[in-house]
């Protein structure tokens, strides 16, 4: 099920964020960087974002649930990078992560659809996102 995230999701978001990072970036980022990730720190970050009305107004966070557990999420909002704003990218997709076991089920497309609709509802028609050049699976998905 796709839905907007709430502050009650912060703990699960933190856990999924770290697990998905470890799955996605193993072999692409230094092990020390991955080992330094903390579900508690990520949960606190999501609690700040979801609990702050000014942050929530700028950032939309969606979750995918399977059997009442969050298995993926995406976030989008106003472009934070001034260089990209100057190039006409007024919006950004700041995160999209799915646990590997949940990939290939259409959840990623559902998240992208929700974020695209959110961005369009804000009057934007150009969006940017960052992806590692070496992350072939993600690049294939976005293309």
Predicted features along the sequence, with ranges:
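Short acidic/polar active-site loop segments enriched in Thr and Asp
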Residues: 125
């Amino acid at each position: 099920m796709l839905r907007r995230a709430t502050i009650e999701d912060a703990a699960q978001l933190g856990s999924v964020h770290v697990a998905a990072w470890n799955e996605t970036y193993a072999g692409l980022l230094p092990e020390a960087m991955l080992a330094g990730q903390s579900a508690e720190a990520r949960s606190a970050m999501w609690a700040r974002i979801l609990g702050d009305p000014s942050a929530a107004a700028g950032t939309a966070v969606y979750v995918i649930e399977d059997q009442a557990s969050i298995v993926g999420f995406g976030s989008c909002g106003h472009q934070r990078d001034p260089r990209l704003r100057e190039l006409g990218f007024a919006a950004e997709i700041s995160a999209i992560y799915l646990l590997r076991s949940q990939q290939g089920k259409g959840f990623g497309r559902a998240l992208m659809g929700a974020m695209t609709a959110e961005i369009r509802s804000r009057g934007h028609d150009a969006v940017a996102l960052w992806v590692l050049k070496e992350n072939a699976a993600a690049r294939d998905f976005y293309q």
